[in-house]
């Protein structure tokens, strides 16, 4: 099957699903994102871009332990949450999922320019999940 489902759960939290296998990205904690209800999700895997409570609250996700085979290959790219090489907000990790010729990247709270090598890893994306708020992350022009 060559179909991937992407569901936005609020803030930078997404669920990506293929062939019955689901991955939740960046679950946020209670009261960390104004206006959003607490999360209560179920998935086979959780991936977090960094350890801030609005991106790394893994307690919001119940793992299925279903034994379903992971159809994705996962590439991780270490970046920064700010333009000062992490001095302001620490590290960030980009996750790239690939399956059956489809390629998706979750950028986390990227806050820095990418190197040529990092950009090369992000070529030929079918979907990109990217923040563009401009305060804690890059802005729309930088994106």
What are the residue ranges of the model-derived segments?
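Short phosphate/oxyanion-binding micro-motifs
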Residues: 60
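Core dinuclear metal-dependent hydrolase active-site scaffold
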Residues: 1-45, 52-54, 64-127, 134-141
